UniProtKB/Swiss-Prot annotation:
Keyword Signal: no
SUPFAM superfamilies from the UniProt entry: Metallo-dependent phosphatases (SSF56300)
Name of this protein: Vacuolar protein sorting-associated protein 29
Role noted for this protein: Plays a role in vesicular protein sorting. Required for the endosome-to-Golgi retrieval of the vacuolar protein sorting receptor pep1/vps10. Component of the membrane-associated retromer complex which is essential in endosome-to-Golgi retrograde transport. The vps29-vps26-vps35 subcomplex may be involved in cargo selection.
Self-association state and partner proteins as the record states: Component of the retromer complex which consists of vps29, vps6, vps35, vps5 and vps17. Component of a retromer subcomplex consisting of vps29, vps26 and vps35.
Keyword annotations from UniProtKB, A to Z: Cytoplasm, Nucleus, Protein transport, Transport
Main subcellular localisation: cytoplasm
Length: 187
């Protein structure tokens, strides 16, 4: 089962559109579920995601003002309990310790979070944390590292029992690069 984890679009206020290179990869019928971590900021992005896959889980981002979406959600895939949130209410934002507390509160084996616009994947305290980054490469206005360029990215998760295979898609110098990672649930 392939699950697309994507977010932080900020279309049209910070980015004009999703890259055509990414659009060519996101083919309807190939993805079983989408988990969107918010900050769509336009209904056209929501409609596009629903076109790619009708099974769309969505949480509200800091800039989704009219969204009725929840701020967090939880699903089970294989043997994993997966929590997901935009991350804008985590204080301090992107703090591994604060995210670890949230994962424990959600009783999650995997915590998906957004908000920083930068891809991240790491294990801490028996939980695996994944931030898919910004799908459009939209700048993060609250980031301290203003000169750091945001790389457009998203991830595909393939859950096989107690193993998560993560495919990280990023655009570098106009070309899509894919990195494969694996996480095994501790016994």
């Amino acid at each position: 089962m392939l699950v697309l984890v994507i977010g932080d679009f900020h279309i049209p206020d910070r980015a004009p559109k999703l890259s055509e290179k990414f659009r060519q990869l996101l083919i309807p019928g190939k993805i079983s579920q989408i988990i969107c971590l918010g900050n769509l900021t336009s209904t056209s992005v929501y409609e596009y995601l629903k076109h790619v896959c009708s099974d769309l889980k969505l949480v509200k981002g800091a800039f989704d003002i009219s969204s009725k979406a929840p701020i967090a959600g939880k699903i089970t895939l294989g043997s994993f309990k997966i929590g997901y949130t935009n991350g804008h209410l985590v204080v301090p934002q992107d703090s591994p310790e604060a995210l670890s507390i949230l994962a424990r509160e959600m009783d999650a084996d995997i915590l998906l979070f957004g908000g920083t616009h930068k891809f991240a994947a790491y294990e801490l305290d028996g939980c695996f944390f994944v931030n898919p980054g910004s799908a459009t490469g939209a700048p993060n206005v609250s980031a301290v590292e203003d000169d750091e360029k945001i790389v457009p990215s998203f991830v595909l998760m393939d859950v096989q029992g107690a193993v998560l295979i993560l495919y990280v898609y990023r655009i570098f110098d106009g070309e899509v690069r894919v990195e494969k990672m694996q996480y095994r649930k501790p016994e």
